[in-house]
């Protein structure tokens, strides 16, 4: 009998047969695609040898162009040339108009308030535009590898929220790609450097791209990549350098009109060219809208210094979160084209006390890391022992009685992760429970962020505390959160996948963490008070039910003592004296002990009525 050749699920049946995978850096300004060939990760170039693909799409009635061809139309047809679409991903129209009031596009709101861009090809959302960029990258990879891709790893900023990550997945699906995983950009950079050097210790990944800034503090140990802490700014990058310089040129050239989109694009192009030139030269001559002038590196540095300082403040916060000092960081990895700016490299080197790593092209390092990970996930390296442990930036939890937040998954927990906690009903006969998912570090609901609400219905009508509900939080490798609530005895359950329409900015995250530290003592006291008030309400609710059912077991004098104790508890529970409430609860318990014993005896007698001793 011939033997059947078998293989691990998801792997090729033939040991020598490689599956085709690619890593995609879907950037704000530029995008890249990379793959692993002959054991080496490399980015793939177009027919003209260019590795970067500008993240720009130009739309016409009969089609569209992507990349360099699209970018040439930016100044001529601004309204139909979409660039930096990554900034729009997962955001509401109101949010976009507030953050980016000078975008040269016409928007309409969809039924759910999400942005639709008016183009010659019709109304398009950011997901569709991103899909067109991904299609162009996939076509480049398919041609270079002479075959269809089996899967891709796409990188996203560490601070992308659920809606932005889901939008990226939707764009890939629209482009016909199978997403193996979304990978945080700093983690991808750690893969690119860590695998080559095999170095162990703490590494900082400073990622300043076109539209986002991320700082990650990583620990590399025995093949394990663990993100100790993350920080950054989802609305800060080289684009902001460009806009600052463009505004400066506008002032120097005395161009007051901001409504002319063509002039605005010309100014931006001039600013970008000047920024690049100033990385090597001390000064550069600029020609725009009939004006000619000179800009020095010193002037440029003065313009961008406040933004660079903002990135270093985020670095300091991330180090504090990670519990490490700057001098403990062995290496600083530079990622993103904006890290070529001399002032950035200089200030980062001063902050960490060592020159940053730039041996891998900062534009390519993320795509290379994604390609290495894709090669593993597609099954080409089944023996790889590399692990990736990303973290969640803010704690996740539930609202409980009294307006308290019960944390289920603490901040900086590595993902993927699943945690569960058991809860119970508060009132007799309660058949439904509202599940309120919270995010934040404070103790009270009012001080945290609401993520989602859903209801679990069909709970058996039992006495208070009789039903047991298990609530499970699951965060997958892409940072998407699913919450499931299940009543144990019946198996009835309800769940929700959290997809906020738009997420927190880095400053809001930093503010929430800072507030949790500033108000720590106050929050603990507030929580203790709320817990005692909830317990007081539970005791009074239970006592009232018992008195309604079995008041006949008490004499008038005994009833008066219990009523007085209950009235006192009800009164002090309205105040904010934790000790007084606790003592009043103990007093009610003391005064009702005999009553509770009589009720128990009566229940036993009722249960035994009509039965002989032998039957018992």
Curated annotation (Swiss-Prot):
Q: Mind listing the UniProt keywords for this protein, alphabetically? A: ATP-binding, Chaperone, Nucleotide-binding
| The keyword ATP-binding appears for this protein | yes
One Gene Ontology term of the biological-process aspect is: iron-sulfur cluster assembly
Q: Name one GO molecular function term.
A: ATP binding
Source organism:
Shigella boydii serotype 18 (strain CDC 3083-94 / BS512)
Protein name as it appears in the record: Chaperone protein HscA
Supply the NCBIfam families for this chain: HscA (TIGR01991), PRK05183.1 (NF003520)
Taxonomic lineage of the native organism: Bacteria, Pseudomonadati, Pseudomonadota, Gammaproteobacteria, Enterobacterales
Cross-referenced CDD domains: ASKHA_NBD_HSP70_HscA
- Briefly state the protein's biological role: Chaperone involved in the maturation of iron-sulfur cluster-containing proteins. Has a low intrinsic ATPase activity which is markedly stimulated by HscB. Involved in the maturation of IscU.
The record's family statement is: Belongs to the heat shock protein 70 family.
């Amino acid at each position: 009998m011939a033997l059947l050749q078998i293989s691990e699920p998801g792997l090729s049946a033939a040991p020598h047969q490689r599956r085709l995978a690619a890593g995609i850096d879907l950037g704000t300004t530029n995008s890249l695609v990379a793959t692993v060939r002959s054991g080496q990760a490399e980015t793939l170039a177009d027919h003209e040898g260019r590795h970067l693909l500008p993240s720009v799409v130009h739309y016409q009635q009969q089609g569209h162009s992507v990349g360099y061809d699209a970018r040439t139309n930016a100044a001529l047809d601004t309204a139909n040339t979409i660039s930096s679409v990554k900034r729009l991903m997962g955001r509401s129209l109101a949010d976009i108009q507030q953050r980016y009031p000078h975008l040269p596009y016409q928007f309409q709101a969809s039924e759910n308030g999400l942005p639709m861009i008016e183009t010659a090809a019709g109304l398009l959302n950011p997901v569709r535009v991103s899909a067109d960029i991904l299609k162009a990258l996939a076509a480049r990879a398919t041609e270079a590898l002479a075959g269809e891709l089996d899967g891709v790893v796409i990188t996203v900023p560490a601070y992308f929220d659920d809606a932005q990550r889901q939008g990226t997945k939707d764009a890939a699906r629209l482009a016909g790609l199978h997403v193996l995983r979304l990978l945080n950009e700093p983690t991808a950079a750690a893969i690119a450097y860590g695998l080559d050097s095999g170095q162990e210790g703490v590494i900082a990944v400073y990622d300043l791209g076109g539209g986002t800034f991320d700082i990650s503090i990583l620990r590399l140990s025995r093949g394990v990549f663990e993100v100790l802490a993350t920080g950054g700014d989802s609305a800060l990058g080289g684009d902001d350098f460009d806009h600052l310089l463009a505004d400066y040129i506008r002032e120097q050239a005395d161009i007051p009109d901001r409504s002319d989109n063509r002039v605005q694009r010309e100014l931006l192009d001039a600013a970008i060219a000047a920024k690049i030139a100033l990385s090597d030269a001390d000064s550069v001559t600029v020609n725009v809208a009939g004006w000619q002038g000179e800009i020095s590196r010193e002037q440029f540095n003065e313009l961008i210094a406040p933004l660079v300082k903002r990135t270093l403040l985020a670095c300091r916060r991330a180090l504090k979160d990670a519990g490490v000092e700057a001098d403990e960081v062995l290496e600083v990895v530079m990622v993103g084209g904006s890290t070529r700016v001399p002032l950035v490299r200089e200030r980062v080197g001063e902050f960490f006390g060592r020159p940053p790593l730039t041996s891998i092209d900062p534009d390519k390092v993320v795509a290379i890391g994604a390609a290495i990970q894709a090669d593993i996930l597609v099954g080409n390296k089944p023996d790889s022992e590399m692990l990736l442990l990303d973290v969640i930036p803010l704690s996740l939890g539930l609202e409980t009685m009294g307006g308290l937040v019960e944390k289920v998954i603490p901040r900086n927990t590595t993902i993927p992760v699943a945690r569960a906690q058991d809860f119970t009903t508060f009132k007799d006969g309660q058949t439904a429970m509202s599940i309120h998912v919270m995010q934040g570090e404070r103790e009270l609901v009012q001080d945290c962020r609401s993520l989602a609400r859903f209801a679990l219905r069909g709970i058996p009508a039992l006495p208070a505390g009789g039903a047991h509900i298990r609530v499970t939080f699951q965060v997958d490798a892409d940072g998407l959160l699913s919450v499931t609530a299940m009543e144990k005895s019946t198996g009835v359950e309800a769940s929700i996948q959290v997809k906020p329409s738009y997420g927190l900015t880095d400053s809001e995250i930093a503010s929430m963490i800072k507030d949790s530290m500033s108000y720590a003592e106050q929050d603990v006291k507030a929580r203790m008070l709320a817990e005692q008030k909830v317990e007081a309400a539970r005791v009074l609710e239970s006592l009232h039910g018992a008195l309604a059912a079995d008041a006949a077991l008490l004499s008038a004098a005994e009833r008066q003592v219990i009523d007085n104790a209950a009235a006192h508890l009800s009164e002090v529970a309205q105040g904010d004296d934790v000790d007084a409430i606790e003592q009043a609860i103990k007093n009610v318990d003391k005064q009702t002990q005999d009553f509770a014993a009589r009720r128990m005896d009566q229940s036993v007698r009722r249960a035994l009525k009509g039965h002989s001793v032998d039957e018992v």
